[in-house]
Amino acid sequence: MVTIFTNFVRYNKIIHSLPFKLILVIIVALIFGNFIPEVLKAFLLSVSLSIKSLLLFILPLIIFSFAFCSFAQLSNGLLTFTLLLLSMMCVSNFIAVLCSYYAAIISQSIIAVIIDTNSTHAISLEPLFELNLPRLCDNTVGLVLGIALGLYTSIKKLLILKQIAKKFADTTNKFLNHIFIPILPLFILGFILKLQHTGALTILFKNFLPLLLVLISLHFLYIGCAYLIVMNFDIKRVIIAMRNIVPAAIVGFSTMSSAAALPILTISAVKNVKDHKLAQTIIPSIINTHMIGDALAIPLMAISLYIVKYQATPEFSVYLVFAISYVLAKFAAAGVPGGTIIVMIPVLESNLQFTPEMSGIILMMYILFDPFCTTANIFGNGLFPIVFEKIWCSLKKITKLS
């Protein structure tokens, strides 16, 4: 009886999980797409576009809330500590994004598919209506205001503003977890049906498995090499350090949420450093911002889609602007399923000429691959305090000597 109940709970969790729902949406579109009336497809596309418009309308507030909270909680107002932490997060994310660019180009022979325009319908699917909401302000404005107010709060040690920042971020997290994420399958459905209508979905679906294999390989190589370098190629230390992070990685894989793994990750990271308080301060500060898995995955997916769409590789100068924008936008991301890609869609659209359909595809791909990305994020965050401790201790010695 207990076994039956346990199996029921397990299967119930699977059925209600986001990846299962998204896979179901894709299967429904593939199998029943041709039987769905075109007017219904157009209506569902209109709903998807309207949800996107609503998201873009409130996105500056979402970005502001997470940036404000992230910077307000940093280092208890210690400016030097904060600047070092910010610099290391930016450099780490930037290096990962650049590596992903070259990895994407090298692996395109495995990933990329040339779209046969003769295999698609000549008639495109147009929405019945669109919800065109004005934007409150540019996303950059929300980001800059959040960073500025957060730093001011941290430096001045304003407890009331810290509490406000946390409540604001908690409210935003509730909106994402309880409103936006549950309607993600509906959000995706309209774009998927449009792809099915034009015949592009079948072509794209063939590409998922090779892309996933390349992505997992990239995560494994990058993070493995990072641990080896930091541990001076001491295999035993690498195994011990990574083994300590495994429990947090399992939680992250199953929940697709870095935030959900935060308590376990903090406990795990403490085992890998000498200064336990340092790790306990760093992990909550970087959990939503320093995401190596995302920094490798999103550019890889974005470049692959760009090549499929435009039959060309984005110029490095264009990609460099995207990389900088990516690093800045990461300060506004949430450690919830789909949190990063939500704030990255405007960056992709403005820097890499992403269309609404491409945005819908990468959102779907990101959610499907999110367990692997989150696992990589957690291993990356487990390594971060080790690197930070080395640099921070060296900096303190230099300061004392001078």
Where do the language-model regions lie?
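Signature of multi-pass transmembrane helix bundles
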Residues: 11-37, 49-58, 83-240, 398-402
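Juxtamembrane helix-boundary/capping and inter-helix hinge elements in multi-pass membrane proteins
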Residues: 37-38, 70-80, 108-109, 153-159, ...
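Membrane-water interface of transmembrane alpha-helices in multipass transporters/channels
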Residues: 43, 79, 83, 201-209, ...
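Short amphipathic alpha-helical coupling elements at transmembrane boundaries
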Residues: 45-56, 163-178, 244-251, 267-271, ...
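Hydrophobic transmembrane alpha-helical segments of multi-pass transport and channel proteins
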Residues: 54, 90-94, 98, 216, ...
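Small-residue-enriched core segments of transmembrane alpha-helices in multipass membrane transport
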Residues: 85-94, 172, 208-225, 244-252, ...
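Transmembrane alpha-helical segments and their short flanking loops
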Residues: 112-113, 300-402
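Helix-loop-helix junctions within the multi-pass membrane cores of secondary transporters/permeases
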Residues: 252-330, 395-402
